[in-house]
Design a protein with these regions (language model features):
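Short, hinge-like loop/turn segments at secondary-structure boundaries
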Residues: 89-94, 140-143, 236
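Positively charged, low-complexity intrinsically disordered leader regions
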Residues: 1-41
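A charged helix-plus-loop insertion that forms the helical arch/lid used to bind
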Residues: 86-102
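Short acidic, glycine/serine/threonine-rich loops at helix termini
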Residues: 84-88, 133-139, 228-232
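N-terminal catalytic cores of NTP/NDP-binding nucleotidyl/phosphoryl-transfer enzymes
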Residues: 26-85, 190-196
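Buried hydrophobic packing segments
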Residues: 58-62, 175, 198-206, 301, ...
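Divalent-metal (Mg2+/Mn2+/Ca2+)-assisted nucleotide/phosphate chemistry catalytic cores
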Residues: 15, 97-219, 224-226
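Conserved nucleotide- and phosphate/pyrophosphate-binding catalytic cores
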Residues: 205-402
Length: 402
């Protein structure tokens, strides 16, 4: 017999807020008593399709619910992507074209099943019902809410006070997201804490449209990125992508602070609350070294997107390069046909910097090495020969000037 209390404790792990906990417990119990599945919705606008660990906080919890009777309704907001979620934005977002949306949606589908059970997942597109809503339906939807309530949102309030334009279409976004819940008739909706206004809209519209059930809500914290300060974001560069190579996933995870490690354990690890507490106590007592705890976390995260053997290989590679100070075995190789090349251009050519300006910054920061020797001369020229270029601790390239 399933231990419902233990399952609910596992579901609560790392959660920021649950609305209608009793309903979720009833759904779980009904599954084990009667075999009745329930539906979990999470929406993703395909504006930036490459998933990173921040996205997996919600996806991991959905994968857990799949083990206890949940059918995930993975909603790709191809229609709402034409508006763009205004949450946290200080200006109106650029509208994406259909071709870009379709391409990004395909990328999502390729990546999400690294985490979710495909056999218990329904991929849905909100254009299915929103594109046929029509003017009458849109007017009816818009009449369910008022501008004063919309302006309760912090981002809209700030923009209104600063006289920054707010498009009418942006007011429609939370309404359309809420209507998704009406159309999908989900039992649970999931999202980050920054989505609370939009998530509550689904409950409100469920009552308005009388769909017969009110969705419960599970809100997850926003994952703090590698810098230990800001939420994980591609634009800030403090992220780990789920499709990155295993060596980078392992090494980047090891780079986080000891303090942040425990937050990541709670939000990204499959360990139970008790297991994490015991590990933390062991570290505090000096029985387990913090580096060992962090290595175990890095192994678990890397294995989730690859497998345990590949994760172990990534650890061996890290030890080889960083502990034994040996060169990585999988360096990319480049060749330049010239008598000599400026070091700044060489770094850009080999992909070790995104621009000449960034290459100069790396050199000034003492982050560039040639053949494992630091350099500070940004005017340096490389003549014919072979060189090992390095930026920072983890990025290498082999360059042959011929």
């Amino acid at each position: 017999m399933a231990d419902i209390n233990a399952i609910m404790q596992e579901i609560k792990k790392g959660v920021a807020e649950i609305i209608d906990f009793a309903r979720i417990e009833t759904l779980i119990k009904n599954y084990y008593d009667n075999g009745a599945n329930f539906y979990i919705k999470a929406g993703f606008d395909p504006t930036a399709p490459d998933l990173h660990l921040g996205h997996t906080v919600v996806l991991n919890k959905m994968a857990l619910l799949q083990k206890h009777g949940g059918i995930v309704q993975f909603l790709i907001g191809d229609f709402t992507a034409k508006i763009g979620d205004p949450t946290g934005k200080s200006a109106t977002r650029k509208i994406l074209d259909d071709e870009t949306i379709a391409k990004n949606a395909k990328t999502y589908k390729e990546q999400v099943f690294k985490i979710l059970d495909e056999s218990k997942t329904e991929v849905m597109f909100n254009s299915t019902w929103l594109s046929t809503l029509g003017a009458d339906g849109l007017i009816a939807l818009a009449s369910t809410f008022n501008v004063a309530r919309m302006l309760e949102r912090d981002d809209f309030t700030k923009r209104y006070k600063n006289e920054t334009p707010i498009a009418i279409s942006e007011f429609l976004y939370p309404l359309l997201q809420g209507y998704d819940s009406v159309a999908m008739k989900c039992d649970i909706e999931m999202g980050g804490t920054d989505q609370k206004f939009n998530l509550l809209m689904g409950r409100t519209l469920g009552r308005t449209y009388g769909i017969g059930k009110e969705q419960a809500i599970i809100m997850m914290p926003l994952l703090v990125g590698l810098d230990g300060v800001n939420k994980m974001s591609k634009s800030l560069g403090n992220y780990i992508g789920v499709t990155e190579n295993p060596n980078d996933i392992f090494a980047k995870t090891l780079s986080i602070s000891d303090e942040l490690m425990w937050v990541w354990y709670e939000l990204l690890s499959s360990k139970s609350i008790d297991e994490i507490s015991n590990l933390k106590l062991s570290v505090q007592k000096g029985e387990t070294h913090p580096k060992k705890a962090k290595e175990d976390l890095a192994l678990e995260i890397t294995a989730r997107f690859y497998d345990e053997q590949i994760a172990a290989n990534a650890k061996s590679e890290f030890d080889k390069v960083h502990s034994k100070k040996e060169l990585p075995s999988d360096m990319p190789e480049f060749e330049m046909n010239t008598d000599e090349v400026w070091i700044v251009e060489a770094l850009s050519y080999c992909g070790l910097s995104s621009s000449n300006a960034e290459a100069r910054r790396h050199i000034k920061a003492n982050a560039v090495s040639i053949d494992q020797q630091k350099i500070r001369d940004e005017q340096l020229k490389l003549t014919k020969g072979e060189y090992i270029l390095q930026v920072g601790k983890r990025t290498y390239a082999k360059l042959k000037v011929v």
